[in-house]
Amino acid sequence: MSNTAYIGSGTTLSSKYYLRSFYRSNREAGTSSKRREFSGNQLALADGRALRQAVRRLTSSDFSDDQDANTRNSVLAYIQTYNNMLSSAGSSSDRTLERSAKQLKNITSEYSSELDKIGITVNDDGTLTSRTTLFESADLSKFKELFSADAAYMQRTSTYANGLQAAARRLSLLTTTG
C-alpha cells in the first residue's frame, strides 16, 4: 500500500503538513517544542534532510492558480526549515557545516530584493520572515521566479542544501563512531 497522498484541485494543505513532510525522517526535529531534546548534530542532520526535501517539493511545484494556497504554504514551511537549518548549523563547531550555512545565507541575501517583493524578509542574521499581507497577495508568478526548478535561487540553494546534509551526515557518523 502506498503512503503517497494525491492532492486534487481544491484541496489545501497547511504549512504544518508540509513541515511534517519535510521532516518525515525525524518528525520531532521539526517541532519547536521537541528540538531542545536533540543534540546539535542530530538537529543538523534532520534539518539538512528537511531542507533538501523542501527544495525538492518547491522545485516540483507547478505554481498553477489552483495550487496557490499549497504553494504559499509549502514556501512557509520552507522558511521554517531554512531557519532551523541556519540555527543548527550556527550552533555547530564543524567548520564545513558553518561555511555551507554562511554560503546559504549569502545566496539568500543576494535574492533579498526578489524575496521582499513576495513578502519574505531576509533578516540581519540571515533568517527569513514572512510578512503576511504581502506574502498572501503577491502574484504567484513571482514565487515561480524564485522557487521553480529553473530558478537560479533554488538551484543554488539545492547545491548548498546537499552540502549541508552531507556535512551533517559526516559529523553525525563521526560522533556516533568516535
Explain the meaning of each model-derived region.
Residues 1-178:
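Polar, low-complexity export/assembly segments characteristic of proteins
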